[in-house]
Design a protein with these regions (language model features):
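N-terminal chloroplast transit peptides
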Residues: 2-17, 21-25
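Active-site-proximal substrate-binding core of FAD-dependent oxidoreductases
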Residues: 633-638
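Mid-domain catalytic core of redox enzymes
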Residues: 323-324, 350-491, 598
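Active-site/ligand-binding neighborhood in enzyme catalytic cores
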Residues: 216-342, 349, 570-586
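A glycine-rich dinucleotide-binding beta-alpha-beta segment and adjacent secondary-structure elements
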Residues: 271-295, 474, 478, 542-613
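C-terminal segments that line or cap access tunnels to active or ligand-binding sites in enzymes
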Residues: 425-563
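N-terminal glycine-rich phosphate/pyrophosphate-binding loop and immediately adjacent elements
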Residues: 33-225
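A conserved FAD-binding loop/helix module that cradles the flavin
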Residues: 102, 609-632
């Protein structure tokens, strides 16, 4: 059985169509056999890297992607799932779509660039979906990826019931699908938001814009020079002017809260300006007990204000929050089509159990079949802390051991928060919610700091293991309502809601490392029991009820799917069950973050959220471009 499974994989590679011409020299004789590249994981990093390598070296490489999950979990954390509910009133079924990972799309041009660089389809023949106003078709749309801007970008809801919308681009008329009445409605909402900013503190609107301008300078300099790893000296003057303004009160490497205290008086404005720090696994507040106020580990340096500019700046050409029509599953599907057009081979339900410089050991989903596949180069899209601890061999002579799957991770890193996710299907429309909503606790300065305690305390503080209900504690959370932008997410008159509540990561137990993977995962899932999940659900429902019309929300809840860190560990082998990966303190940022090339292996490269440059789909796409370049150089030198 094992030999037949290995033969099947080998034949899949050999049977792939080969292009006879290519634009780049590989420094090899034309009669040389193709070099085999194995990519572990069909996440965004794996798919993008595969497409870039194969499109650059079409005839001199065979690229094979091995994915442990089935076809339904293509894209790794970047994916969606459906819930089907029997419609007892009208017969038939109700279909709800939910996101399991990312729910907002940033740096749209990074997605476009991948399809422009590797695509083989004619954009002029693309289906533009339901957007009849869009006459300029893109390479991404040729592969079915349509991205619609969310305006406003966010609704921020405070625990006293105050709410404000932020993120209004100046060029609203250019946004897809907006009619003149819709534009006028948004203009009224924007004026209401400006008035609200000025109510929060004198000149609040101008202070807010001043903050976004500073953050835009950080973004314009940081993206090319520190994320894309390409020098752009033209951005440095504006960066330095903003950093040194007001006696260097906006210095980018100080704790984020220090800069916010210098700019704002209102706790609500400070909260609005810093909630994006959650995405990079950090709190905004200075930690007096740590060196540099905590910026080396758990406190966000002020430079991460660039995330606010990326999402909310009205005129910056990189700014804007978008939604992929059809959900983030469509992002992965479009990328798979891109790979297949470039003759990349993908094999699902296949787990890699060991990586060596010579190739990989693998096993089928039920572990009844497996073997060894040699490779000239291996690219690992599995989570770095998991891979280095569990599947990356320490010896080039490794025989693969038992060739059974395990789950463990390196807990020496600093991690982002874990997440308890509620995926709710409702029999009513939840009109009080925008596409993206952030609920923040700011009743007092103490509450504002305490609401981020899960990021400061980490493993020392489970969500409610202090015997105090979450309802009695300040906490922040995020709510996604996909149907506000994309009506296909829920049936007419219904809604799909995702709630993300930060929690502690899994606590590593070294004794579980030797157990079969399923047994270890089961024990880790027990760290988040039903009582804890129930407490979090009740706390969220209570906070949601502050919005008009949501006081009896549970009455129309018809289905619930709950994910905890144990779920994410099971589905995606992420270290600590943390969907956001490693945090981005200065000790794990840029050159101090795990790089693409592990020092112990010459023929292995890493790509993905926990490696350089960092987490989030656009950063992973940038990382994939950098890793593909390294891979091509390695292959050409062999």
């Amino acid at each position: 059985m094992a030999s037949s499974y290995l033969l099947l994989l080998s034949l899949a590679i050999l049977a792939s169509p080969q292009t006879t011409t290519h634009a780049f020299s590989t420094n090899q004789p034309h009669h040389s056999p193709p070099q085999r590249v194995i990519i572990i994981g069909a996440g965004i990093g794996g798919l993008a890297t595969a497409a870039r390598i194969k499109s650059t070296l079409p005839s001199s490489t065979d690229v094979l992607v091995l994915e442990k999950n089935g076809r339904d979990k293509l894209g790794g954390r970047c994916g969606s799932f459906d819930v089907t509910i029997v419609d007892n009133n009208n017969g038939g079924a109700l279909l709800f779509r939910h996101e399991r990972g990312p729910s907002l799309l940033l740096l749209k041009e990074e997605y476009e660039r991948l399809f422009e660089d590797c695509g083989k389809r004619n954009p002029s023949a693309a289906d533009t979906g339901n957007d009849s106003s869009n006459t300029t078709r893109t390479a991404a749309e040729a592969y079915g990826l349509h991205m619609k801007q969310c305006i406003p970008a966010y609704q921020v809801v405070f625990d006293d019931g105050d709410a404000i919308s932020v993120g209004f681009p100046r060029s609203k008329c250019q946004s897809s699908g907006l009619t003149i009445p819709q534009i006028k409605e948004l203009q009224i909402l924007e004026q209401q938001s400006i008035a609200k900013l000025n109510q929060l503190e004198p000149n609040g609107s101008s202070k807010w814009q001043e903050y976004l301008n500073t953050c835009a300078a950080f973004l314009d300099c940081g993206l090319p020079n520190f994320i894309e790893e390409r020098l752009d000296v033209s951005t440095l003057p504006a960066f330095l002017i903003e950093a040194l303004k007001d006696g260097a009160k906006r210095w980018p490497l100080q704790p984020h809260s220090v800069m916010l205290d210098a700019l704002f008086d209102s706790p609500k404005l400070k909260a609005m300006a810093s909630f994006q720090d959650l995405y990079v696994g950090l709190e905004p507040y200075r930690n007096e007990g740590q060196l540099g106020g905590g910026v080396l580990r758990k406190t966000a340096p002020a430079v991460f204000g660039l995330l606010a500019a990326l999402e909310l700046h009205p005129t910056n050409d990189k700014a804007g929050v978008f939604a992929p029509i059809g959900g983030f599953r469509q992002v992965a599907e479009s990328m798979l089509e891109l790979c297949l057009d470039n003759d990349v081979q993908c094999q699902f339900d296949t787990s890699v159990t060991r990586i060596t410089d010579e190739g990989v050991y693998f096993t089928s989903k039920d572990e009844s079949e497996g073997g060894f596949l040699p490779a000239d180069l291996i690219i690992c899209n599995a989570d770095v802390p998991f891979a280095t601890e569990t599947i990356l061999s320490e010896s080039s002579n490794d025989d693969g051991g038992s060739n059974s799957s395990k789950y463990d991770w390196n807990d020496k890193f600093d991690y982002s928060s874990g997440v308890i996710a509620f995926h709710w299907s409702f029999s009513q429309r939840i009109e009080a919610l925008n596409t993206h909503n952030v609920f923040m606790s700011v009743k007092s300065a103490e509450d504002a700091v305490s609401s981020w305690s899960i990021l400061r305390d980490g493993d020392d503080s489970k969500t409610s293991t202090n015997n105090k209900s979450l309802k009695d504690q300040p906490f922040n959370f995020y709510v996604h309502r996909a149907s506000h932008t994309d009506e296909s997410a829920a049936p007419p008159g219904c809604d799909s809601i995702m709630v993300l509540v930060p929690c502690a990561p899994l606590v590593r137990n070294p004794e579980l490392a030797s157990l079969p993977r399923d047994e270890a995962i089961l024990k880790y899932k027990q760290q988040f029991d039903e009582d804890l999940v129930n407490d979090v659900r009740e706390a969220v429902m209570e906070r949601l009820s502050i919005l008009q019309g949501l006081d009896n929300l549970q009455d129309t809840l018809i289905d619930e799917v709950v994910d905890t860190p144990g779920t994410y560990a099971d589905y995606y082998n992420v270290g600590g069950g943390v969907p956001f990966g490693l945090s981005h303190g200065l000790g794990q940022l840029s050159l101090t973050r795990p790089g693409a090339e592990p020092s112990s292996h010459d023929n292995v490269l890493f790509v993905g959220a926990s490696s350089r440059p960092g987490n989030g789909v656009p950063l992973v796409l940038i990382g994939a471009k950098l890793v593909a370049k390294k891979a091509i150089e390695k292959l050409r030198s062999k």
